[in-house]
């Protein structure tokens, strides 16, 4: 169970809509209640959806900062599907036009190999076996599901490592775009951080760990450096020590 709960640190700190927040909370409740009730098969399905949510949040961040590469990766899709993927206003809409196994292809944009993608997506095949009538219970004891969760968490950490340059770029863009207090959406730094860093980019605590390593001194000559420093301090104060 402890390994499973660690996934929470890889999921967004908070969500921009109540429906998204309630959806993720529902998945956690479904996982924990079924795990506690020893209904491990159903617990695994809920955890799989949490895992796929993590993947979709990562792809969302890639889409934001590698927009042209993301467009190039859509070659071969129908025009309608391509348009909907580009126009998606939430990561959850990716699955309206993508099969779960297809979404992993976008991780190649951050240097993941075909072998990596195969490891990341293998859980989809296992889930498909569980989600259809088979006459067999795959996860019938705690040892089996704990091993599966540990395997999934290894891949979560692997994806997170590959995502670090993307996260740093997300953060740098936020600091620069929001540095001018007269031009940004919210004058109050806490509100600006929540809306345009956390919510817009679906930022997690693990993402923030990477953000906290960012050296803002490289922007010391920027006309709005005080704004950059204020935002960086705000992020550190609110989330950096959690």
Task: Name what the model sees in each region.
Residues 1-46:
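Charged alpha-helical initiation segments
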Residues 1-5, 143-242:
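Terminal, compositionally biased low-complexity regions
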Residues 5-18, 52-112, 133:
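Short non-catalytic regulatory patches outside canonical folded cores
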Residues 18, 106-173:
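Charge-enriched, short contiguous segments at helix-coil
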Residues 22, 26, 98, 122-125:
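Generic alpha-helical secondary structure signal
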Residues 40-44, 55-67, 139-140, 165, ...:
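Short, solvent-exposed secondary-structure capping/transition elements
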Residues 49:
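Gly/serine-rich nucleotide phosphate-binding loop at the start of the catalytic core
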């Amino acid at each position: 169970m402890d390994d499973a709960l660690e996934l929470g640190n890889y999921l967004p700190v908070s969500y921009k809509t109540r429906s998204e927040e309630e959806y993720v909370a529902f998945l956690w409740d479904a996982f924990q209640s079924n795990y506690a009730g020893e209904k491990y098969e159903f617990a695994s399905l809920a955890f799989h959806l949490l895992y796929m949510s993590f993947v979709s949040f990562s792809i969302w961040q890639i889409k934001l900062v590698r927009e042209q590469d993301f467009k190039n990766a859509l070659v071969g899709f129908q025009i309608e599907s391509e348009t909907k993927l580009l126009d998606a206003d939430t990561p959850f809409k990716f699955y309206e036009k993508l099969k779960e196994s297809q979404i992993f292809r976008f991780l190649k944009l951050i240097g993941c190999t075909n072998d990596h993608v195969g490891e990341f997506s293998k859980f989809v095949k296992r889930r498909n076996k569980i989600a259809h009538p088979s006459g067999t219970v795959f996860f019938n004891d705690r040892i089996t599901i704990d091993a599966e969760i540990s395997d999934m968490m290894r891949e979560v950490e692997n994806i997170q490592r590959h995502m670090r340059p993307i996260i740093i770029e997300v953060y740098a863009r936020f600091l620069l775009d929001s540095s001018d207090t007269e031009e940004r959406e919210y004058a109050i730094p806490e509100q600006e951080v929540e809306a345009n860093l956390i919510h817009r980019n679906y930022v997690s605590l693990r993402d923030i760990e990477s953000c906290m390593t960012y050296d803002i001194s490289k922007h010391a000559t920027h006309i709005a450096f005080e704004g950059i420093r204020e935002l960086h301090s705000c992020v550190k104060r609110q989330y950096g020590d959690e």
